[in-house]
Structures are given as C-alpha cells and as structure tokens.
Amino acid sequence: MRLDELPKSARIEDRRGVTVARGGIGIGTVVVLGLIGWALGIDPRLLIGGAEMMSRSGGPQQQADAGSTTSTGSPSDTMGQFVSAVLGSTEAVWTDYFAQAGQTYKPPTLVMFSGATQSGCGFAQKAMGPFYCPIDQKVYLDTSFFQDLERRFGACNVGSKTCQFSQAYVIAHEIGHHVQNLLGVLPKVQQAQRAMDQTEANSLQVRVELQADCFAGVWANRGQAKWDFIEPGDVDSALQTASAIGDDRLQRRSQGYVVPDSFTHGSSAQRTRWFTTGLKSGTVASCDTFRNEQL
C-alpha cells in the first residue's frame, strides 16, 4: 500500500501508555469488530444490543481522566503515521462523497490506546478489538490487534507489505460505522433491535456489519482513484482478512462448529462479497444490505 501521497489526519488521540482507572463496565452502543467473541471465548451477543444497555443505564458511562500524557494530532512513530494516513484518506473520501450529496461530513476522532481506556460507551479493553462508539463518535484502536489478526488468525501474510492494506481495511470498516451513524442507519437499527428477539437482532446486526464492509470497499475504490495507493497483492490481502474474521470461521476455530443464528458480523463469504461489492462499484447505493435478501 502506497502511503506517501495520503493526507495525514490530526484527529487522533494517542493514549498509548496512558493508565486509566476503570469506570463503568457498560459497553453502551459500541459497534464491535467480529473478532471479539468467538476468538476469545466470549459470546459476542453480550457485546451488542448496546441501545438496550444504554436505556437501562440511563446514558453514557462516566469517563475517567485519561491523564496528562494523552496527546492529540498526528503521532510521529511508524504505526501512528500509518493510522494517521489511513484516517486522513477516509476523511478525504467521505468528505467528497457527502459534498456531492449536498451534505457536510463530520469526521470522527480515532483513539489509539494500549491495553484499556475509557470510551463514551464504557470501559474499552484490548480484547474487544477495534470498535466505533456512536455516543462520542470516536473509533477506538489498540494497534496490537493487528498482530493478533496476522499471527493468530492468518488474516494476511505476516511481515508482508500487503498487511498494511488489511490493517487499513479494518480501520475503514470502523469508519464505515461512523458513516452509518451520520446517515441515520445506526439509530434506526438500534431502535428496531429493541423489539426483536436475540436471533432477529443478530440477523439485523449482520446487515450493519456487512454494510460497513461494503463502505470500506467504497473507500478503497475512491481512494485508489485519488491516490493510486493499491499495490499488487493488497486486495487479496484484504479479502483474506475479511474471510479470516467471518463468524463461521471464528466459531469453527473456537468451538469446532458453526451456529448461524448467532452470527453478528456475517460469514467469511458474505464479508468478502460485500467488501468486493463496494470496491468494484465505489458507490454507497450498492451497499444496501438491508434490502438485499441474498447476503
């Protein structure tokens, strides 16, 4: 992945190395990446349905002081510069898209942390994987997740330069949730899930996640047109990652069998299909997972 021409984002809070006191444990309306549950032996159904949790708790969790060592702006280290470049590219792509629709894109902040931190949706831990919190409109990322993605789950070839594009796909997926929030998709889904049983809520959540995968593909398409940043092997690497974090593959790895009714992010085939859909079309209209009967 070529990064040289990508705009750098300053909308980063660097909390790596910052120790925080644990506050409330509510996860709120966190939208999580699928690796969380089945890979670590945690039922992911406990980590979604955040709107219900928020209604019971009465609002966002009180955040602890992140400490005076939190810095803002583009970090100077290699990983920080990479995240800044990917985030900057998403800002440019989605700013253009919203402008074409006569709207204004309000970019999220990305929080880099190590181990644990506080979010507007509650206490965040490394085991949760990257996630987007609609309450504070921030993406939370413990970058050691990328090591797990590569070494433990074979999401891309460890040490290969193409792993960068896989990592960028993960970030673009979370930004996709922010786009969903701005478009009003997340609030509607959360409202609908309140009236559903767990199986129905899971099924709807899958459509949310697959749309975020498609939006990540839209970012890749439009970013390629702007900066020609995709190198040979990059797309295959991203597809390998999407497949590696499919619910069926994670369940089979963790428990030896698959329970489709418990899927919350989609199968490997579905995730790769929807990322590819966005990548080929470059249009948000192609990402309507809610009206598509065949996922």
PLM segments and residue spans:
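Long amphipathic alpha-helical segments used for membrane anchoring, targeting, substrate engagement
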Residues: 1-76
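Active-site recognition of the HExxH zinc-binding catalytic motif
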Residues: 35, 94, 141, 169-182, ...
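Extracytoplasmic
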Residues: 82, 89, 105-108, 126-128, ...
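Catalytic zinc-binding patch centered on the HExxH motif and its immediate surroundings
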Residues: 116-148, 152
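Short pre-active-site segment immediately N-terminal to the catalytic Zn-binding motif
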Residues: 147-170, 200-206
